[in-house]
């Protein structure tokens, strides 16, 4: 192999190594973001259940009437 070919191969290997590292970092970040999404989804589900429960309770509440002095 010529010196120029060896340099090109080394440059390609370095590029591949950097890309592999970047892919691994992005994969880790994506996994972390999915955890956050799942936590947010669980919170939203709990809030939705609570809201629906409160809404049902408010339907059963007596109607608000005006005091006699109005």
UniProtKB/Swiss-Prot annotation:
It comes from the Bacteria. Pfam families: SlyX (PF04102). Belongs to the SlyX family. This is Protein SlyX homolog.
